[in-house]
Amino acid sequence: MCALPSPRAQRPPACTRTSKNSCALLASRYNGSCSNDFGRLLASNLKILRNIILKDDTEFVKVWSKTSKSLISYESGRIYFDNYRCCYSSLLPEPELLYELPRTPKTEKIEDALLCQCPLENVLPNASEQKSCLLTLTANNWLYLLSADTGETLQRVYLSSRFKFSRSLGWDSSQETFYVKSVQCKQTALERQAGVDNNILMRVAAFQVFPLQLVGMLEINKKVFGKTAVDVLLSQGVLAVSHSSKLVRLYSFEYIVNKFRTEELILGQQCELNNARGIVGDAPYGVPVNICIHECPPVLFEMTYFENGVQIGGHPWHYIYTPNHKRHRGTHHVCSITDGALAKNGVQDMKCDSLEVDWIFFHPDDSGRIIHAGPSTINILKIMAETGCDWKYEIITDFSITAARDSNASQVIVTSSGRTVKRRFQMLDDDPAQETFRMVKYEDELDLLAVVDITHAEDEGQARLRLHDNKTGALMKRVPLEEPWDVTYSHEVYFDRDTIIHTVQEKNNSFCCHVYKMKRPASDQP
């Protein structure tokens, strides 16, 4: 006979646990009572990791450094050197080489790449398609699908023998649809002599991933979209066309595909289109134009702006822009996308007296909030419906993060001869003598804001990574970075679970990557 477990021995619902103690969470996981599916188990593990990282005695120690003559890239536990030719894994205690691709001439080097994570909700026909891959664009117009772990070529597509595609990979819908665009077409000398107008601005190809499938290739014609059109991009199913007059127009890409696609093309199959025959995606045929836009699609949205373009996001939908007038320089306007109405308190102005401008963007945590950051202040803003009026909105400050400033001490300096001199001018907000914010990142798995602040000591910039709670803004931890921070060179900092990666451009146009790993003190043994 099998005895039924008593009610006390049954697994409690995962959502009812309130303990924040890491030891208790580890014990619950060991006993199997923390969750009944992988998603909840992962969330529990990340909660434990967050608690460990934020402990006072937890440190981050530099474990590895490597220099490069070309730009260094990082994404999802992988560090790429030499134009994506060499890949190192940062998931181990020290980074190790995952793969190294054969050297190629400059005409075949990788110029851009996207990391494609494997889909969890779909089972694909081929096992190789179920794993993460690196999508690369080479200088000779080849699109390669490489294994993210071995560098093995899984698939390749030739784009065009007529148009040059360069440094132009981007996500339309993240991990679902991507696009690649050609460089802008310029009128040749022969065309000018013959009086022929070249109205083709560029070509844009859209693909689906997992498995790799062609959506279509389209031409951006100035006769259709306007003579002032200068650039395009795809994002969230919207084709955005920018104009030299600081105007942006948005069009539905789904509408364009449904109305103007003349034929659905399949990679690797024979095709006869536009008076040419070949295999789609093979050289020299490439990918022909199968989306022929002969009339302007309906405009979903248009806006003129002063600088930095237009951003769309938030809950409900809003957009951020700077009106196209000099008097609005330095301000950011938050407006409803429904009717264009400016939100109450929607004009955000840092009033920064600094060399570097402030920056603003929608929070990547999908909360609909806005991050507005300057050299001394970071404001986290919320879009709220006005009291008693559901169709009008106002911008309120959720919380602010401020840098430590001593205005009195900053007015007096001591010269090399020992004389005390009082400043005759006000210090800039990003003066090297003061603590200054340089960047703000969001660690989604740990729900932490990572803020880089810079201070100066002994004529060298010293950087620290501050970890703030994403919900309250409370400062949880400071992590010093060992290498000096020279503001005249470009820097990038990534915070990914238990790893901090700092890439920096150094003198002589060389680059260096520094990797820090979480370290706990050794437990006392009896």
UniProtKB/Swiss-Prot annotation:
The chain crosses the membrane at residues 200-220, 237-257. It is found in: Membrane; Nucleus, Nucleolus. The keyword Zinc-finger does not apply. It comes from the Eukaryota. The keyword Ribosomal protein does not apply. Pathway: Protein modification; protein ubiquitination. InterPro entries: DCAF17. GO terms for biological process: protein ubiquitination. Keywords: Membrane, Nucleus, Transmembrane, Transmembrane helix, Ubl conjugation pathway. Coiled coil: none annotated. It is a multi-pass membrane protein. One of its GO terms (cellular component) is membrane. May function as a substrate receptor for CUL4-DDB1 E3 ubiquitin-protein ligase complex. This is DDB1- and CUL4-associated factor 17. The lineage of its organism: Eukaryota, Metazoa, Chordata, Craniata, Vertebrata.
